[in-house]
């Protein structure tokens, strides 16, 4: 009665994430409300500006605050952690502006520490792969639309179904830049896997399929930003 889980649903989020959240809440007896996140309708969002995440988070948390107040609650919390402090995270500005709590950051917990504590508590999500919305796969300034979001979603699902543990398919025009864990690069370039991935991604709409030799890392689209932009 004291907690409501609010889950966003939109074309920027894979259906698998929504289904996993629903299953978790149902299994643990948590009241869940699913809210439509309509970020593609936000003025300027589709143009993918550098403050894209701010635009989305501000709109989403305004909706969540409305739900909280309708249910007699006076607090809203989100799940960022200390690792998020080291990257460009304009969404955290919206968190601060709207008075949303960040308990994991306030406790100064890193992602690794959260995983360790989750494992000790027996939570099935302790080793869940990191996830960020599909809009974060687009190079800044490239138009975001439903078709390309679908291309990214299908490409990442393919890689997960093939047994890769942490994946990103970054989109540069009609070029796919694949990131997998460094330890899985050897696997992805095996002839059978390489040809299957290239064939499928071209089927999904990509013209070229490339592999990032640095491997998976969070926020790789921010590597082209100047330090002064990141500090804003």
Region spans (language model):
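Residue-level detector of family-conserved "landmark" positions at structurally sensitive sites
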Residues: 6, 35, 78, 128, ...
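Peripheral terminal appendages
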Residues: 1-4, 153-232
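Short, conserved beta-strand edge motifs with alternating hydrophobic and charged residues
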Residues: 76-79, 133-135, 168-170, 179
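Mid-to-C-terminal catalytic subdomains of enzymes
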Residues: 105-109, 115-159, 166-168
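ATP-dependent adenylation/nucleotidyltransferase module used to activate substrates
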Residues: 1-120, 161, 176, 192, ...
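Short, electropositive alpha-helical surface patch
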Residues: 88-95, 142-146, 226-232
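A general structural signal for short secondary-structure boundary/capping elements
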Residues: 53, 148-152, 225
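A short, flexible beta-alpha/helix-coil linker loop
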Residues: 40, 139-141, 183-185
């Amino acid at each position: 009665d004291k907690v409501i889980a609010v889950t966003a649903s939109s074309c920027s989020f894979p259906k698998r994430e929504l289904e996993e959240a629903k299953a978790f809440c149902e299994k643990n007896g948590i009241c869940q409300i699913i809210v439509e996140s309509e970020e593609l309708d936000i003025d300027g969002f589709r143009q993918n500006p550098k403050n894209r995440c701010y635009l989305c988070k501000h709109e989403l948390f305004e909706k969540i605050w409305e739900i909280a107040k309708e249910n007699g609650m006076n607090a809203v919390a989100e799940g960022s952690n200390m690792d998020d402090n080291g990257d460009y995270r304009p969404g955290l500005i919206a968190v601060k502006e709207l008075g949303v709590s960040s308990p994991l950051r306030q406790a100064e917990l890193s992602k690794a520490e959260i995983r360790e504590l989750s494992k000790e508590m027996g939570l099935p999500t302790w080793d869940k792969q990191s996830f960020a919305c599909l809009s974060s796969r687009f190079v800044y300034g490239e138009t975001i639309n439903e078709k390309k979001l679908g291309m990214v979603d299908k490409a990442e699902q393919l890689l997960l179904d093939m047994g890769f543990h942490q994946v990103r398919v970054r989109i540069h025009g009609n070029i796919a830049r694949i990131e997998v864990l460094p330890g899985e690069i050897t696997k992805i370039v095996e002839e059978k896997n390489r040809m299957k991935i290239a064939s499928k991604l071209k089927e999904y709409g990509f013209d070229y399929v490339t592999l990032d030799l640095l491997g998976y890392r969070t926020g790789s689209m921010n590597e082209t930003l100047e330090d002064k932009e990141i500090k804003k």
